[in-house]
Amino acid sequence: EDELKAAVQAAERLYKNGCLAPLGVCWSALLAGQTLETALAIVPRQERFYADHVRGEDARTFVIVSDALRYEVAQELTERLHGRLSGNTVCTAMVGTIPTITPVGMAALLPHKKLTLTEELSVLCDGMRTDASQREAVLRAACPQSAALELGVFRRMTRAQRQEIAREAKVVYLYQDVIDRAGESDGDVFAACETAMSEIEQAMRMLVSELSAACIYVTADHGFIYTRSPLEETDKAERELAAGDVLCYKRRYAVVRENVSDERTLSMPLTMLGRPEWACVTPRGDLRFKQQGGTSPYMHGGLSLQELVVPLIAYRNRKAGQKGYRAITKADIVLLGENRTISNGIFTLVFYQQEAC
């Protein structure tokens, strides 16, 4: 047990010091002195999701929004879906909306012409509130045949109830909160990621088999930074770095009324939220602002690669004969080696898979 703990600690140090820290430094250097629009101009933006993918789609569209589904988790989910769902599944990336928090990311994924951050720090879509109870109204303002509900509620419905929703709605948003809930409550984030992937896969299989879904998207409001070990003092930045008229101060970000620059922080104007005179200030790399009681290793809100990049899984259910159709078949394997005789109770067999995954 002691050896296992030592191995876990060594792996954690290697990840933090050999990957997370240097990657954070390089990423911060890329963003420094620029806006997201200029620094990442060639990457699709989260706020354009509905306009680019949902509006104008002929097929009934299902959108699964998983709170804090990080890009790497979505990539693993995509690899699983390749072997379990016929059709075509592709995972690409989008640039999230800052600060990378749930109210902002969820609003950005809804239909809108303009996003607005209010003085109370709530986000409006064309003047409409975007909290959970109001998202269906925002969707219906763009497409009257829309529905929004929790993924868990949808999965617990009877087949007839799910079919009734599909008959009445052209656009269905399904919301999942597994990863973020575990992270915010100091739960096991790794286990939560596995649960989230399993639930999404089951939901997609259900949508395809029961409702003949031809177009499914899976995306997220934001990503996250996570390490197993609690934060140390060296992981924290002084609160004074968030200078100016501070409207909101959290461990990974602060919203200030003026765009101030400091070599120890990144400061981005909130242009996408209709507040170009305001700024989101975050410590460079993976540091956190000092805050009483702030020791949780799960974090989001900042501008790191892990927080800012959100996935977009696009699934198309192609039928046989259609372009892009991919049938699920069992792979052929052959036994390597000439020896076909088992001479004792301990032996090794080496197989070769003839087709690529």
Tell me what each language-model feature is.
Residues 1-357:
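Feature captures the catalytic ectodomains and active-site-proximal regions of enzymes
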